[in-house]
Regions:
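Short, hydrophobic/aliphatic alpha-helical segments
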Residues: 40-48, 186-191
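General structural signal for secondary-structure boundaries
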Residues: 20-21, 39-40, 147, 162-170, ...
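Conserved ATP-binding subdomain of kinase catalytic cores across diverse folds
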Residues: 42-162
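Regulatory N- and C-terminal appendages and interdomain linkers associated
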Residues: 1-44, 176
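Conserved kinase catalytic-core segment
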Residues: 95-111, 165-192
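A short, terminal or domain-edge coil/loop segment
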Residues: 31-36, 41, 65-67, 170-185
Length: 192
């Protein structure tokens, strides 16, 4: 059975595991992919700690914020960092099987349809289970927050109501705040 790259889905060469070096560089900034040293059991326990510390990321799906850490003479590895990581990790869920694979495939299909998407990939836990990882576009290479507005902020809605809006409302907000409103609203309608 042939192995495929978790980033681009193309066949891997001899000696390559999970990623082509150039694909690792695209998503992780290094040809050597950082280790994801956790297992499913670790993630469940760590996620509970993150929830207790109230440093969770908003949204419907369970997710964790990661960053890459390195020590002298040690390979780079992902660590869970609360809100300020440069990556978001979405593990498998009991409720919806294969959710990471579905999300990654959906993003690949969107790219093929010429929709701009964030850098994303599948990645393996230490126990071999797949998770979805995406690079945050609201962080600098050093992890500093970049100012970005989202539709909740522009509409002055709390994030817990972000899934209780309409496309029409979003289009009106785009028309109100965009510097090129007609172009942006056309792009919005093409994406939805």
């Amino acid at each position: 059975m042939m192995s495929r790259c978790l980033y681009c889905y193309q066949e891997l060469g001899e000696g390559e595991t999970d990623f082509h070096p150039q694909c690792g560089k695209k998503i992780f900034g290094s040809k050597t992919v950082p280790l994801l040293p956790y297992t499913k059991a670790d993630i469940k326990q760590l996620a509970e700690q993150v929830i207790r510390s109230q440093t969770t990321l908003t949204g419907v799906q369970a997710k964790l914020s990661l960053d890459i850490s390195s020590s002298p003479n040690q390979p780079q590895r992902f660590t869970i960092v609360g809100l300020w990581g440069r990556y978001i990790l979405k593990p498998q869920t009991e409720q919806f099987k294969y959710m990471p694979e579905v999300e990654d495939l959906t993003m690949h299909l969107a790219e093929l349809a010429k929709v701009n998407v964030v850098p994303h990939s599948l990645i393996r836990f230490a126990d071999g289970e797949l998770a979805y990882i995406t690079k945050r576009i609201d962080r600098t290479a050093k992890g500093e927050k970049l100012p970005m507005e989202d539709m909740c902020q522009l509409s002055e809605r709390l994030t817990e109501y972000k899934y209780k809006g309409s496309y029409e409302k979003i289009a009106k907000i785009i028309m109100q705040y965009s510097s090129v409103p007609k172009l942006d609203v056309i792009n919005f309608w093409e994406q939805v």
